[in-house]
């Protein structure tokens, strides 16, 4: 069974992976609009009638402070600080917010909640995907297999393809526009 998780809880935090500064917090409306578009895009690759779509606020929103403390005890501050983007910010005296440390914990808990056996993500998600394995192990679950795929280079030839940087080719774009961007 393919399960597509929409991060209407984690999306509020924003994934710090590869970011030189904290991401702005998103509203529920923004997250719901994004999810609608993501589902349309997923429909280009998957039969959305045959997959299970879930929202991670359904389980993350129910965690107590005690639950979050247990989750946080799986990792150390040193492990979080080993990540390149935090090292870069530390050297630049740029802020690192505590909520950014929570993102991989919450994404990892998604794997516990759905009892994932495989998780797929980009290479920029390696830490978060492996966090899921550790969290599953700490909850007595069999750790999931992790599959990472390389990130696509953006149309600028410099950064990874992304909507934020405007260097992307949208999956729903007209084929002529797509071709023109390559």
Mark where each language-model region is:
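Alpha-helical recognition segments enriched in aromatics with Gly/Pro capping
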Residues: 3-10, 34-50, 54-182
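Active-site-adjacent loops and short helices of periplasmic peptidoglycan-processing enzymes
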Residues: 1, 9-20
């Amino acid at each position: 069974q393919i399960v597509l998780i929409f991060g209407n809880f984690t999306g509020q935090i924003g994934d710090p992976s590869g970011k030189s500064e904290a991401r702005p917090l998103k509203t529920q409306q923004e997250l719901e609009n994004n999810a609608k578009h993501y589902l349309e895009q997923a429909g280009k690759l998957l039969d959305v009638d045959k997959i299970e779509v879930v929202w991670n606020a359904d389980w993350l929103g129910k965690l107590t402070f005690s639950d979050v403390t247990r989750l946080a005890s799986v990792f150390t501050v040193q492990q979080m600080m080993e990540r390149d983007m935090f090292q870069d910010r530390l050297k630049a005296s740029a802020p690192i917010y505590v909520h950014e440390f929570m993102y991989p914990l919450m994404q990892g808990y998604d794997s516990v909640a759905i009892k994932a056996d495989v998780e797929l993500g980009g290479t920029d998600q390696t830490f978060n995907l492996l966090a899921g394995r550790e969290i599953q192990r700490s909850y007595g679950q069999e750790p999931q297999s992790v599959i990472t795929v390389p990130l696509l280079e953006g149309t600028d030839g410099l950064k990874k393809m992304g909507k934020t940087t405007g260097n992307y080719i949208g999956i729903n774009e007209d084929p002529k526009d797509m071709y023109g961007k390559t």
